[in-house]
Amino acid sequence: MNYLDLILQQQQDKIAIITDDNQYTYGELAQKAKNIRQTIDLTAKRRPIFIHEDKIIDQLISFLAYSGTNHIPIIATDASKNQEFIIKDIPENACMGVMTSGSTGKSKLFWRNYNSWADFFPIQNKIFNINEDTVIFCQGSLAFTGNLNIYLGVFACGGTVIATEKFRPKNWLDLMTKYKVNTIYLIPTKLLLLPKFATLPNTQIKQIISGSQSMNKHDALKLKQIYPKTTITLYYGASELNYITYINDIDMTEDRTSVGKPFTDVKITIKNEEIFVNTPYHVEGISLPFSLKDKGYIDTNGSLHFLGRKDDICNINGLKISTSKIENALIKVFQTNELIVIPSHKNDSDTLKAFIAGEKQFTKQEILKSLKPYLTDFEMPKQFIYLKTLPKNESGKIDKLKLQSLM
């Protein structure tokens, strides 16, 4: 079984995907992939194929064309395009390569077998309320593993994807109305742009799926003002492990560290504040339980709390500081996820700089006063830098490397 076969199993005259330029039935999608497959040397030595297409539909068709052949498709991230990967052996069971987002400048490459995703589709689709009637809106490249996984999960049950490359929230709302979208998949920073542009509530949206960033009850209420009939599901996951935990809006509180309870078959343990995960749906070649080097704890209700990555701890003039803690405090002050804290070393001194999207709202003194209930003096950023927008990678995460080049 492979992903092209998965497409061929669906109702062939049903619309599979609508993009900025065109629409394709399942049959048309399969035929385009078959046309490319006819040009592939299926007798050649097994090797990885890095897909560098810019358009979502070209990424998808190329991926499907190579799926199930002796060539292993990898939809490449922008960060990886200048990287050299030394690939000695591809695991025998591997059907695809997946990459991490590369928010620090480099992407990591992992191998997946078909069942590590396909066997989980029924579980995730049940939690996300995805079925053959789903019409889901997604934005951005399939190099973001979250997008590719959601697409394939929707295709596995015969749903329809509405896809756009454009970063235009007003246009997103128009597309949702035009194509009668009932499900949205976007990361929180993109989701929370929608209330700024929506003029009327949309009762057609029944499900919102989000992840890769934090969200709390306050954020959920903003979204429910424009999508009153929706259920919001936030997940915690990783390229290496698939989905780990999830939480619905009804269970969210003001505590944005809570990421909910484990998916079926996923087990979590905590050792010295480090999160370890045991799951059958992991990439090839890792040992279990696996650590993402994330910090957290499990509360009395069995919910996991994500406290940031271990490498978010930086040394500022001899003191260990958590940039995640500072960012969460800044989110409370600025009421936006569009910010990041980065340590800087200059003139033999370490300082913290906060980058914030948008125009200056407060004086530095006002910000520091607002932060006092949450941070100690040595945790306070020394500089607040305002940019119209913060640079992002394919996953929608803030690109730290590009910001560091501005420092």
How would you describe each model-predicted region?
Residues 51, 293-379:
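AMP-binding/adenylate-forming catalytic core of the ANL superfamily
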Residues 73, 95-122:
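Conserved AMP-binding A3 loop
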Residues 221, 226-231, 240-303, 311-313:
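Conserved AMP-binding/adenylate-forming
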Residues 375-397:
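AMP-binding/adenylate-forming catalytic domain of the ANL superfamily
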Residues 119-135, 143-183:
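Conserved AMP-binding/adenylation subdomain of ANL enzymes
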Residues 183, 195-253:
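Gly/Ser/Thr-rich phosphate-binding loop
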Residues 13-43, 81, 88, 112-115:
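Conserved AMP-binding/adenylate-forming core of the ANL superfamily
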